Curated annotation (Swiss-Prot):
It is found in: Secreted. On the 2D-gel the determined pI of this protein is: 4.0, its MW is: 18 kDa. Homodimer; disulfide-linked. The gene is alta1. It comes from Alternaria botrytis. Residues 28-137 form the AA1-like domain. The keyword Signal applies. Keywords: Allergen, Disulfide bond, Secreted, Signal. Disulfide bonds join 67-82, 121-133. This is Allergen Ulo b 1. It comes from the Eukaryota.
Length: 137
């Protein structure tokens, strides 16, 4: 079970807002990640076929890359790799814009974190139901 992961007690807090004055970053735990630059595409207006975001360490670490996935239809509650050798995976719940991240640190330790990514969708240009979405803060 995901919740039995050893890292749950040390779950990493996330910050989805870019304006830290109105929403301070929590620095509890071993790692702090900032999620920004969320984007996605809904070709039929109801599901994503592409989404991504930037993830950056805010604790002095070197983590700073774009995590993304593409498919004919990205499924809610399914884990997607952030990329080769990243040791990070994500799952997205489109109905609540919820992001779940996990980072495999070792065979015994997995860090887990969650956040909500508010976003705005507009016409995408590839038909009446095509939408392009981007994060808002």
């Amino acid at each position: 079970s995901l919740f039995a992961a050893a890292g749950l007690a040390a779950a990493a807090p996330l910050e989805s807002r870019q304006d830290t004055a109105s929403c301070p970053v929590s620095t509890q735990g071993d790692y702090v990640w900032k999620i920004s630059e969320f984007y996605g595409r809904k070709p039929e207006g109801t599901y994503y076929n592409s989404l991504g975001f930037n993830i950056k360490a805010t604790n002095g670490g070197t983590l700073d890359f774009t995590c993304s996935a593409q498919a004919d239809k990205l499924e809610d509650h399914k884990w997607y790799s952030c990329g080769e050798n990243s040791f990070m995976d994500f799952s997205f719940d489109s109905d609540r814009s919820g992001l779940l991240l996990k980072q495999k640190v070792s065979d015994d330790i997995t860090y887990v974190a969650t956040t909500t990514l508010p976003n705005y969708c507009r016409a995408g240009g590839n038909g009446p139901k095509d939408f392009v979405c981007q994060g808002v803060s």
